[in-house]
Amino acid sequence: MLLSISLILILGMFMGWICQKIKLPSLLGMLITGIVLGPYVLNLLDDSILGISAELRKIALIIILTRAGLGLDLSGLKKIGRPAVLMCFVPASFELIGMILLAPKLMGLTALEAAIMGAVLAAVSPAVVVPRMVKLMDEGYGVNEGIPQLILAGASVDDVYVIVLFSTFVGMMQGEGASILKFVNIPISIFLGIAIGLLIGVLLAYFFKKMHIRDTSKVLIILSISFLLVVMEDKLSTPITFSALIAIMFIGIGLQKKRETVAKRLSVKYGKLWVAAEVFLFVLVGATVNIGYLGKVGVKALIVIIGALVFRMFGVFVCLLGTSLKRKERLFTMLAYTPKATVQAAIGGIPLALGFTCGDLVLTVAVLAIVLTAPL
């Protein structure tokens, strides 16, 4: 296992650095590292690492969501107004609809399998979008028009919305049924997640004010609570549940509202955690990709991905109706809101891990979508 960890970190970071040097996202280098090291090429990774790959990817997702919550400016969301709110769910919904329409005809999937694939692909990647938008704001591009703020505001909530839909579709695939209650549970689980997360965030802010402990210890406490929330959601068998991932993000938001200086310091700590988590996430996703399977579905998968992206871009166009943005600014926003990476890497392998017949296909298309859109 130790050899596998060293190979993942050293080669993953090295390939990421090479990609950065040629103006490509570092995650592409990490994905390639995983594919080469994985069981379908060189087979250099220990089974013990591959066996806990799903848990490690979930930890990475928890880290990026908490970091997003600690840094999300809700006042900015209110200032931008209607378009920012629409960007949280309209483009993802359009892309999901596009996938449900295209995938069954081109890839022979059922509507539910297509919905699972659509939910995996529909999220935009904070790992790609956030650094680029922050750079644009630092350089002053589009700030007066609110373009970077608009994309940043929608990106984090967009992810959580899609993950909740994904969890719902997976539950239906496992035989839990497609009852009306299942769909009613979507907004309820979102609101319960928000309420639970905010409550925990406020309580933690009060606790951290009374108890003077190191920031590293605070991070460990938040991580432990986040893990407990995920386990609780998995164990709940009631018709009405809560979204643990939304709760995790809103812990950061609640903490930020009450103790902004602490939230900023913790965001920096989570940023350092993400350095390692990102390498493990993308290398391990690459390791699960069956290269032979990629060859079989390549062209059809490309058509489905591009078709669904066209639906997504139209969704962004709908969100921007009534704004003062010029044609080029609208086109930039439509393209900037397409990159895939973090969520696809975190949940793309779940259908395969659960033994779904569409699992290999979903993972392959997810990785192909990352390779295709991340450089945009």
Residues of each region from the PLM?
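Transmembrane helical cores of multi-pass secondary ion antiporters/exchangers
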Residues: 1-376
